């Protein structure tokens, strides 16, 4: 996957850096694996905004991606590499030997015609799914289950990878993309390789309109609002914390800069090293 820049013949082209889509082999998704996707506009069932900056955007179909990879010991062939509007990485359409089709996340290096398989004793090559206990140490993996059989939850975004660093007492120690080291049950399945579309982080939309196509609305700074609209609003000119207020706050009045992680969270028992450990 590569990026391409454009001659600045228009203002929107000056800073635009878009993917080349060279790896995409078809523009038509598998109809049997698509479902309708309804927009909420960031509102709940009462019509109130629960998530800001959501609204509009192009109509999408949801692709049913197989995160469990629980069709064991049946080889599959990669038919296509496709764009998925609902995630940052590409997806691959695979067809099993018995004729069943499914979508999986497309790791770096996966190409049309390659064979992939899921099982206990499969080879540790790109696209294969296997339990953590059988993955060689130092291997890059993605789509990792938190509980056996629950389906992959960790390291699924574009360019993400986790490293199997060690094993102890029925657990595998995984170095997460954030740098955190966490214990996973070694019976949890994962997929070998790094998630594709590794240059996604370097994309630039070039104009506000493309961001709106993605369903993202503008973000207005609280400092520029009135006091009735935001705790940081009001004051004369560019007042840092509003008229007479002492601390920057969230829209709901919580002071910025405080730790938000809940004390005695159950996952504390599986975190060996925090991501910000010195």
From Swiss-Prot:
Keywords: Ribonucleoprotein, Ribosomal protein, RNA-binding, rRNA-binding. GO terms for biological process: cytoplasmic translation. Coiled coil: none annotated. Residues 32-54, 221-278 are annotated as: Disordered. GO terms for cellular component: large ribosomal subunit. Transmembrane segments: none annotated. Residues 232-245 have a biased composition (Gly residues). The keyword Ribonucleoprotein applies. Belongs to the universal ribosomal protein uL2 family. One of the primary rRNA binding proteins. Required for association of the 30S and 50S subunits to form the 70S ribosome, for tRNA binding and peptide bond formation. It has been suggested to have peptidyltransferase activity; this is somewhat controversial. Makes several contacts with the 16S rRNA in the 70S ribosome. HAMAP family: Ribosomal_uL2_B. This is Large ribosomal subunit protein uL2.
